[in-house]
Regions:
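ATP-binding glycine-rich loop module of kinase domains
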Residues: 24-97
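Catalytic-loop of the protein kinase fold
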Residues: 154-172
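Juxta-kinase regulatory segment immediately upstream of eukaryotic protein kinase catalytic domains
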Residues: 1-21, 37
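Conserved C-terminal C-lobe helix
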Residues: 313-327
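C-lobe/activation-segment region of protein kinase-like
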Residues: 177-302
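Conserved structural core of kinase catalytic domains
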Residues: 78-140
Length: 357
């Protein structure tokens, strides 16, 4: 077995810890520093960075197992900050922000919590961008290339992240971006049933980062009509109409989803086979949408952006990439390898000689 790439330092803690909440989600919240483990263990640092604790009311062992595999990949520290160890957190929580976390606040007396520990990798892409839109525009293409390189690395090892969005990309003090939160990760080769994807069931039109094919299959499973689904998707998110206006020559959302529902074998086995073939493209949609949204923010909110070098000299190739990666039809969606080839002339990691951690 490969050596642990982190060698996190564990010390015996005394007194109150006290950690600030960094983020919250459906299954739990993250705190910095990591809360105390039951029995008194305290994770102070991981890979030379402060330890962050992700506390959940669900079992995190699967996420940690995948995290260790992800972090054993070449150049992993430059692209990922995955959880690599876990413990049962000490309760009651002494962290002052614990009361702001609904999962902790609303838990029953017999709730069992788990905590995954990962290195602090900065602030979310959303907050980092909002803090300085000019800085974000100046580093946009380098950031995009770096994230594409990371995707090539983990997908080349057979993984799909399955939860890429603005909140699961962190940017550190040097402007290096890393993917976090591999809790929904899966391997397409292992998909035999829908539940192997770990994305649940039930049509959820508010989840714009879910690829159109996921919405289409959930419509089928819930026995909703395509017309109903399209109306709900468009009502919840303006991105679909904006993408159709920006890229008018490609298939519309209605055409793409309709073709999927007509041509795919709509059984548990049929949907699983489709995802074995096209599951990696869920991430292609997600990163394309992230970076397209950021580009649109520049166009809308950054004065003088259309006079910038990025806009005048790189807009053409960037639109090809963004349009390709946000194709509604996964069969023609652009891969990160193809995107890197267009942007840099290379196909893999190291295209921009990223900062080494």
């Amino acid at each position: 077995m490969a050596a642990d790439p982190f060698n996190g330092r564990v010390v015996q803690g005394v007194g109150m810890r006290g950690g600030a909440m960094l983020g919250k989600g459906v299954f739990g919240c993250t705190f910095k520093p990591a809360p105390r483990c039951a029995g008194g263990r305290v994770f102070e640092s991981v890979a030379g960075r402060p330890a962050v604790g992700k506390v959940s009311d669900t079992d995190l062992s699967r996420e940690v197992r995948y995290g260790r595999e992800i972090m054993s990949l070449p150049l992993a520290r430059n692209y990922f900050a995955a959880a690599i160890t876990e413990c049962t957190p000490e309760v009651p929580f002494t962290d002052p922000d614990a009361g702001r976390c609904e999962v902790l606040r609303d838990a029953g007396f017999f709730t069992k919590f788990s905590m995954a520990v990962l290195p602090d990798a900065g602030t979310t892409l959303q907050k980092w961008t909002a803090a300085d839109l000019t800085r974000a525009a100046a580093t946009y293409e380098r950031l995009f290339v770096h994230l594409l390189e990371g995707m090539v690395i983990y997908q080349g090892a057979g993984f799909v992240h399955n939860d890429v969005h603005w909140g699961n990309i962190l940017v550190d003090e040097r402007g290096v971006a890393r993917y976090i939160d591999f809790g929904l990760t899966f391997r397409p080769a292992e998909v035999r049933r829908w539940k192997d994807l770990h994305i649940g069931t039930g049509f959820k039109p508010e989840y714009v980062y879910q690829a159109p094919e996921v919405h289409a299959f959930r419509l089928y499973m819930d026995r909703y009509s395509l017309a109903y689904g399209l109306a709900r998707l468009r009502a919840k998110s303006s991105e679909y109409a904006e993408l159709e206006r920006t890229f008018p020559r490609r298939k519309t959302l209605e055409v793409a989803m309709g073709e999927m529902l007509r041509t795919v074998d709509q059984t548990e086995e049929g949907l699983a086979a489709y995802m074995r073939a096209y599951g990696d493209r869920l991430d292609w949609w997600r990163i394309g949408l992230c970076m397209w949204q950021l580009w649109m923010d520049f166009c809308r909110d950054l004065p003088g952006f259309q006079e910038s070098t990025l806009y005048r000299e790189r807009r053409g190739v960037l639109m090809r990439v963004l349009g390709g990666m946000t194709e509604f039809d996964p069969r023609v969606r652009m891969s990160p390898v193809a995107a890197l080839r267009l942007l840099t002339g290379r196909e893999g990691a190291g295209a921009t000689h990223p900062v080494r951690a």
